[in-house]
């Protein structure tokens, strides 16, 4: 259209709008004008390109060649040759790296007269082809998801990543209906067997990409789901009639075509119902669909009214290449109606044969031009009219974002399917009643699945290789038959039905045998079709894929960290049918995620690492564990440094620290709160009511409440051990070997006379009450130990373990860890040269507690950060955790609240200091609802109900000398607490 006429037309249309358009239609028509303006501009650009291209250059636009970014310069030279001599229209990238691909794309685009359309075959994202990029779940996994909005979000994110690396088209989604369990090529690339589910999910994935600047390509038309062979190696045959094809295979394509999908890829299939012509004598097979005009033009373009890009499947695949030579094959694909020739074997031969076909009149130049215009319109649509070189700076970080990782986690979480839960075992509850073992079949070492299970319960772990002998499997039965529950993970499976998906007969026999002695839960990290092997199991989960993410999430799901909602996308048997899956409740235990999951940018938490490393470098502590949880999710859990300054043993997350005075809230408080709820104590009761031996002393009338808030007037502490340091006294009181008299272990190979406990209590009884106001004191907690043991009719440590810690599922919360754990897991607390004359390792650091055998109300408890966080989460939940109520909400609120204006204390619990004149043990940014405690060895635990936040810091700042006060003077614990609140504020995640 001449420019003058275009100007007049546009001016007339604008005047019409000004003088005629009603107000209520103005917005609608304005949008239409914008759309028309876009079409005009697109047409202008397309026609400009057509005018400057020669007929040969137009032919070149039909080719999309294969490119790699992991090959040498010879490959790049070959691609540049195709660009410069055959004017190819695009390329599809396969294996390589994102940086090299971006660099190559920039060079290729610069060398091309017409912008290149860059594609990738990335069904599950860039990670399907490129190293060091993220892999999204495969489509069969996605088929189990019930919320299709998540697939739209996935499409959005994959499009973002594609654009960042210079890709404009993704050859996805696969919308084949997988109604053949023996399909060797589609299988887990399909959303499943239900056409409606396939269509809905295909649309969601497609629209997410298309709305964000990347063209989708629906494949493999007219449907590759019901085949028994792979078109990469042969021509598969589908013998369904036309009614079946229209009802099943074609349905998803019809739906995506109605949603204007940009591309459709035609498969190499033999479908006599669609085209029964013989491919060529003497071959008896019917025409491959890619080369069939009846399929491509008559069915897809005319009957189904598809106007987008029609793309062949790769032309080097044996499904077509075995019938025709390069060049001839490409011409036949064009004659069938395809627009883009994908992965031609020989561009030069194809180019020449197409020219010959035009010259002979087999195909007209106008037909070529029509397809080229369609290709150019697509290029304009994705912004190639204004191509800008890809910026390679920070490319890896831009691709592999935390938000993308979070989305992948959400997808997998939503897919995991609880196929059977007949005994209502999942999520696991009442852990105190269970003895649990785990078995990974198909693994040689402890799996990520098993490691994550460790965070929820005490579990004994076992492994078996799939190749192990029947005898080895039988021996494993002997190891496991005594457990009440066995969790079995099936790993390294395959998709071959003929090989029973990689599950050995011995594994099935072992599972069936164990079922008779234990409650067995099987988690299949692989094909849902393999479920047919487990018809007799009551508890069965399928995670679809075997990777670190599915393993970590499956372990959390079993223990109720999040709800299970997935449904089977295919039928494995009449019992395990499409759509089957049980729903569970979630959020009953801690979940393990990333900061972005709770609205915090992980970058803002990075100063924690710097503070911790500097503290270690400055000699404030040899090492530490730091944990942050928000909204019931652990979002930061790291260990730093070593057990000692000798750098001999690095700190691991599972290592165990002496909690010191955190014992008050993590042990004694629990017992007293239970006694309070059961009416066994009142806050204004006196000690004398429970301890008649105090009659006549100044301790008898001390009120429980006053001791809890440190206002009973007691001395801060009494160094009982100092009276035993004299050599003569020491010889009378200690032995290096335990016997019936010297039975109190105060350190390794050092035992105190058991009757010396009476001396300790007598000393406390006769001590003065010098203080009339607030004074922090340990002494009352010696008496609380006696009270609780009398109440429970057992030792304090046994009571706490049986009533609380075992129920919570903690592994490391305990007194005297030297009895249960290897010293390599226990962090030493001091090199005591004064009293114990040894490294204090696995024994309580506090001298008073040590002289009571390591169990007391004020000190003696050990833990790692995770188990302490579990306990704090129970309190943050107002007394509820793991499906069990430990305390009434009112009890927790009473004990954790401020008690009066004399101090910042709650009942046992410490609180933020409201008076700015005094030092604050917690962050000044913490809400006044926050509660917790610090510990002498360099520990703290804080929970903030207002922000649903938990902060744990464990260290051994007392090693090698308890006089080291650098941790406190540098305010390390509080600085880290500050960073957490600052991160929430900066992220607006509060």
What is each stretch, according to the model?
Residues 700-928:
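Short, surface-exposed loop or secondary-structure junction motifs
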Residues 54, 101-116, 126-128, 193-367, ...:
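Second-shell residues forming the walls of enzyme active-site clefts
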Residues 618-625, 646-709, 767-780, 856-859:
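Short active-site loop at a secondary-structure junction
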Residues 5-12, 16-82, 292-293, 323-597, ...:
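Preference for extracellular/luminal or secreted protein segments
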Residues 593-630, 634-636, 798-802, 833-990:
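Catalytic loop of the DD-peptidase/beta-lactamase superfamily, centered on the K-T-G motif
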Residues 89, 262, 375, 616-650, ...:
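A short, well-structured edge-of-sheet supersecondary motif
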Residues 98-117, 146-164, 368, 373, ...:
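Active-site-adjacent structural elements in enzyme catalytic domains
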Residues 81-98, 181, 257-287, 485-498:
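Short acidic, glycine-rich surface-loop motifs adjacent to enzyme active sites
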